[in-house]
Amino acid sequence: MSQTYLSLTVELPEEASEAVQDLLHESGALGLEVRDREAPLMPGVRGPNPGEAIIIGYFDERDTAESARDEVASSFPEAKLTLDEQPQQDWSNEWKSLIKSVHVGRLWVGPPWDKANAPAGTVQLVIEPKMAFGTGDHPTTSLCLAAVDAYMAEHPGAAVLDVGTGTGVLAIAAKKLGAGRTVATDNDPISVELAQENQAENGTPDIEVSGKELTQVEGTFDLVLANILANTLIELAPLIVAKTKDRLVLAGVLSHQRADVEAAYRNLGLTVLTGATQGEWVRIDLQR
């Protein structure tokens, strides 16, 4: 383990605090600190001014921290950003307190240490988050799980593609709800390895999990899921649309990014459906 970790400090208007917290979470932060003007601070630690928020994301990899910084800068150009290196702390148990189980439709999704609390009668997914995104508790994942639950109820046996699978949670949910061919891809080798571990843990060995590019994935799919960041969704739009036979579900999009993402896919011939929102996050549903 590295002897240092990185802290990304974000200073910006307090009305954007929740959205920034969600974005840092999605971008791979191991933990977040939100400084409150009402709470006592350590000597020498600056609290926010009136109308200001200070959010600090903690990372153990420089590439991840720098990528998160760039995403925040792109989405919140008014933010002041500071990336610092700090002495390493023991994160081995601290991050577990940040992970919560969720109950979405027929699905219960949670970490191994909370499995005993899963309600009877639910379709249970045990997801070990480690360093990949997607345990169910983040709004973007919950929004996608609801879409998977609804689609699979009406289309048993549907072929499903999960782009940017992270922990594999969406692909595993689809398979456990009755999907046919299920493919999960991610360009992060750590995510691929973890998704394969979660696949084995959940008894879904026939999901095709790999680091393949979309151009290497054969066939088209009834349901395509892509819970990644808005800029990447726009960049990959032609490839994602080419794999979509019926329904496309996009997430990882903040409300102010919605119009641009929808336009990219509408221009490729898809029809925008109602979708869903949770806080500052939106889910965009499209039809071939």
Swiss-Prot record:
Known InterPro entries for this protein?
Ribosomal_L11_MeTrfase_PrmA, Ribosomal_PrmA_MeTrfase, SAM-dependent_MTases_sf
Write the Enzyme Commission number(s) for this entry.
2.1.1.-
Write out the annotated subcellular location: Cytoplasm
Q: Where is the major localization of this protein? A: cytoplasm
Task: Please give the biological process terms from Gene Ontology that the record holds.
Answer: methylation
Q: Which UniProt keywords apply?
A: Cytoplasm, Methyltransferase, S-adenosyl-L-methionine, Transferase
Q: Which region is the signal sequence?
A: none
**Any GO MF annotation of the entry:** protein-lysine N-methyltransferase activity
- Report the CDD domains cross-referenced here: AdoMet_MTases (cd02440)
Residues given in the record as S-adenosyl-L-methionine binding sites:
T141, G164, D186, N227
> Pfam families under this entry?
PrmA
GO annotations of cellular component type: cytoplasm
Q: Which reaction does it catalyse?
A: L-lysyl-[protein] + 3 S-adenosyl-L-methionine = N(6),N(6),N(6)-trimethyl-L-lysyl-[protein] + 3 S-adenosyl-L-homocysteine + 3 H(+)
Biological function: Methylates ribosomal protein L11.
Q: What family is it from?
A: Belongs to the methyltransferase superfamily. PrmA family.
Name it. Answer: Ribosomal protein L11 methyltransferase
Q: Which organism is it from?
A: Myxococcus xanthus (strain DK1622)
Give the gene name: prmA
